[in-house]
């Protein structure tokens, strides 16, 4: 049986990689992927604690986070496509101004 510490260390590493991607990258798609990585790290933490406690609450929470992440990805991708069609770029520094 794998100790919970390993799961939590993996979740922390995934979350840090996602945070690094959000803070450093300039491409909107990479930022969305980094946010998804951070949400998956939270899911791993929920499931690890649920396994440790022996209940299903963490699994239910992870399921809802997955549903919210899917909606966020769909809406975010639609916004990125709309911005790319209107401006021709998806770099975040080009999106700082709201002027067309």
From Swiss-Prot:
Keywords: Cell inner membrane, Cell membrane, Membrane, NAD, Quinone, Translocase, Transmembrane, Transmembrane helix, Transport, Ubiquinone. Its EC number is 7.1.1.-. One of its GO terms (biological process) is ATP synthesis coupled electron transport. It comes from the Bacteria. The chain crosses the membrane at residues 4-24, 29-49, 63-83. It catalyses: a quinone + NADH + 5 H(+)(in) = a quinol + NAD(+) + 4 H(+)(out). GO terms for molecular function: NADH:ubiquinone reductase (non-electrogenic) activity; quinone binding. Pfam families: Oxidored_q2 (PF00420). It is found in: Cell inner membrane. One of its GO terms (cellular component) is NADH dehydrogenase complex. It is a multi-pass membrane protein. NCBIfam families: PRK05715.1-2, PRK05715.1-3, PRK05715.1-5. NDH-1 shuttles electrons from NADH, via FMN and iron-sulfur (Fe-S) centers, to quinones in the respiratory chain. The immediate electron acceptor for the enzyme in this species is believed to be ubiquinone. Couples the redox reaction to proton translocation (for every two electrons transferred, four hydrogen ions are translocated across the cytoplasmic membrane), and thus conserves the redox energy in a proton gradient. Belongs to the complex I subunit 4L family. NDH-1 is composed of 14 different subunits. Subunits NuoA, H, J, K, L, M, N constitute the membrane sector of the complex. This is NADH-quinone oxidoreductase subunit K. It comes from Myxococcus xanthus (strain DK1622).
């Amino acid at each position: 049986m794998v100790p919970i510490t390993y799961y939590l260390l993996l979740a922390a590493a995934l979350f840090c990689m996602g945070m690094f991607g959000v803070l450093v990258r300039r491409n909107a798609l990479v930022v969305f992927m980094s946010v998804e990585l951070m949400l998956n790290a939270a899911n791993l933490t929920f499931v690890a604690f649920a396994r440790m406690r022996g209940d299903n609450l963490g699994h239910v929470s992870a399921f809802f986070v997955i549903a919210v992440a899917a909606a966020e990805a769909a809406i975010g991708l639609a916004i990125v496509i709309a911005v790319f069609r209107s401006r021709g770029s998806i770099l975040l520094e080009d999106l700082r101004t709201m002027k067309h």
